[in-house]
């Protein structure tokens, strides 16, 4: 899953 700070891998 894409987060604000980058890709969290989920």
Curated annotation (Swiss-Prot):
pH behavior: Optimum pH is 4.5. Active from pH 3.0 to 8.0. The activity decreases sharply above pH 7.5.
Entry keyword annotation includes DNA repair: no
Any GO molecular function: catechol oxidase activity
Temperature dependence: Optimum temperature is 60 degrees Celsius. There is only a slight decrease in activity at 75 degrees Celsius and a sharp decrease in activity at 90 degrees Celsius.
Catalytic activity field: 2 catechol + O2 = 2 1,2-benzoquinone + 2 H2O
Enzyme class: oxidoreductase
EC code(s) of this entry: 1.10.3.1
Cofactor note: Binds 2 copper ions per subunit.
Family, per entry: Belongs to the tyrosinase family.
Name under which the protein is recorded: Polyphenol oxidase
């Amino acid at each position: 899953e894409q987060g604000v700070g980058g890709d969290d891998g989920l």
